[in-house]
């Protein structure tokens, strides 16, 4: 009953999204950094150890760390909150090349998920929905980090994981502690599907 009430309440506040053109399916660029079997992440024209998928992981990590500046290492320990929070732009643009994340960023959380604030309607940004357009936009963000930063380290794109996903048209469930208090294994199993 609680889950039904939550689903109905969530749909009452939802707005109908405007139709938008979905960009063509993400296709890798013709950037010369892409080779058969490996990617030249640092764009130096040779396969470094960290770029070699057949090299032992410990060697790859050591090689990458040896090439990183203090600024790049620091940025890999940072989570940047996405569009409408810290990020003012939904997609990479020229200003990103001089922003803090020009050296990469460890993670971007809740980027383009449509959530603005409890009690407010979802963001009307066209890159939130439909899901195919959202995927395209997230791929464009990753393209910036891979193709536009010195070492090409992808960012970890994350979203609220405690209650499912904090995103437009997604179902939010109570926290694990709240679900556990139901003592209803069948209900918990259905939440997981």
Language-model region placement:
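N-terminal beta-rich core of secreted/periplasmic extracellular enzymes
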Residues: 16-193
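Bacterial N-terminal signal peptides
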Residues: 1-11
């Amino acid at each position: 009953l609680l889950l039904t009430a939550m689903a109905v309440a969530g749909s009452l506040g939802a707005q109908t999204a405007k139709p938008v053109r979905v960009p063509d399916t993400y296709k890798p660029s013709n950037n010369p950094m892409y080779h058969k079997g490996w990617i030249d992440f640092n764009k130096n024209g040779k396969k470094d150890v960290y770029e070699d998928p057949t090299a032992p992981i410990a060697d790859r990590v050591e090689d990458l760390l040896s090439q990183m500046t203090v600024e790049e290492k620091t940025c890999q320990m940072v989570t940047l909150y996405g569009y409408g929070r810290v990020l003012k732009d939904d997609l990479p643009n020229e200003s990103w090349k001089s922003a803090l994340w020009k050296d990469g960023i460890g993670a971007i959380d809740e980027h383009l998920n449509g959530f603005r604030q409890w009690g407010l309607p979802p963001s009307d940004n066209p890159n939130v929905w439909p899901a195919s357009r959202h995927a395209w936009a997230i791929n464009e963000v990753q393209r910036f980090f891979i193709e536009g930063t010195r070492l090409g380290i992808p960012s970890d794109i994350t979203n609220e994981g405690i209650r499912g996903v904090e995103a437009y048209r997604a179902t939010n469930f109570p926290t694990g502690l709240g679900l556990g208090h139901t003592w209803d294994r069948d209900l918990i199993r259905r939440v997981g599907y």
